[in-house]
């Protein structure tokens, strides 16, 4: 099972120029399921992405989009989505209770017939108290589910070692940390944010539960335009993770 996540920066920061970079790298990556955050709801940004990916792949990659807008008026502008090439059995969403943020869950059917839960989230800006509260809501939501292999992915707006990451790590594992012994050097900002200062931060994660083995993990969507080093798919790098469900006792 190959998963990816990317904050796509809605249609800001040279979207019309960078969108082909995003689509090309998505074709090359070809995840089974991908979470996206900061998605423009109107016009339909996700719709353009999946149509362009299908065109570039000559029909080989066909994704269905499962969108969830932010709550309230903010939902007219922005939301999150999961793109899936696998059959989706059910979908659900969760109000995270602050800054109009939401999380979503899609349950996919694996080629072998098993079910797999994918949680996609974009946690709020501001303090760790806010984000820890949102993370706790997601964890409680996950615990209420039947025991299925599950991942939580997205832009969590928090750094390694933060209270939010520590909370999540009590019951989940960071895929990148598990494979490499550390998180990436950074996931944001990329060269697209030309005026950003500092060394950047890790804000994006893929967490897995104990019913999954992590086979590989790394950053993704790193390629810049060969003629313009400041033009890149987004202001975040993405993550790419390959996992295998652990055998279960009959």
Task: Give residue spans per PLM region.
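Active-site beta-strand/loop signature of hydrolases that rely on acidic residues for catalysis
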Residues: 2-8, 22-46, 83, 106, ...
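Metal-dependent phosphoester-hydrolase catalytic domains
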Residues: 107, 143-150, 158-250
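Membrane-interface helix-coil boundary segments and nearby low-complexity
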Residues: 1-5, 12, 215, 248-250
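Active-site environment of divalent metal-dependent phosphoester hydrolases
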Residues: 11-13, 41-44, 100, 126-129, ...
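Structured beta-strand-rich core segments of catalytic domains in phosphoester-bond hydrolases
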Residues: 15, 33, 37-119, 123, ...
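Charged helix-capping and loop-helix junction motifs
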Residues: 19-20, 131-139
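Phosphate-group recognition and catalysis centered on beta-loop-alpha active-site segments
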Residues: 8-11, 230
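Soluble catalytic domains of enzymes that build or remodel membrane lipids, polysaccharides, and related
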Residues: 110, 127-129, 133
């Amino acid at each position: 099972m190959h998963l990816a996540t990317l904050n796509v920066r809605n249609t800001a920061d040279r979207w019309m120029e960078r969108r082909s970079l995003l689509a090309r790298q998505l074709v090359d990556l070809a995840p089974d399921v991908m979470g996206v955050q900061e998605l423009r709801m109107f016009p339909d940004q996700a719709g353009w992405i999946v149509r362009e990916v299908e065109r570039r792949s000559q029909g080989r990659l066909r994704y269905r989009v499962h969108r969830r807008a932010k709550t309230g008026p903010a939902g007219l502008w922005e939301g999150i989505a999961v793109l899936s090439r696998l059959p989706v059995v059910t979908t659900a969403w969760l109000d995270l209770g602050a800054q109009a943020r939401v999380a979503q869950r899609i349950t996919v059917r694996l080629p072998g017939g098993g079910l797999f839960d994918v949680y996609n989230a974009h946690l709020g800006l501001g303090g760790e108290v806010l984000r820890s509260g949102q993370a706790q809501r997601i964890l409680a939501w996950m615990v209420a589910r039947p025991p299925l292999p599950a991942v939580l992915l997205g832009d969590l707006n928090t750094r390694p070692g933060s209270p939010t990451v520590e909370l999540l790590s009590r019951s989940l594992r960071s895929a990148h940390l598990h494979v490499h012994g550390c998180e990436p050097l950074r996931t944001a900002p990329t060269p697209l944010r030309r005026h950003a200062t500092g060394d950047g931060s890790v804000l994006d994660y893929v967490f897995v539960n104990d019913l999954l083995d992590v086979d590989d993990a790394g950053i993704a969507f790193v390629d810049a335009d060969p003629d313009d080093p400041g033009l890149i798919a987004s202001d975040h790098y993405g993550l790419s993770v390959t996992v295998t469900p652990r055998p279960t006792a009959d």
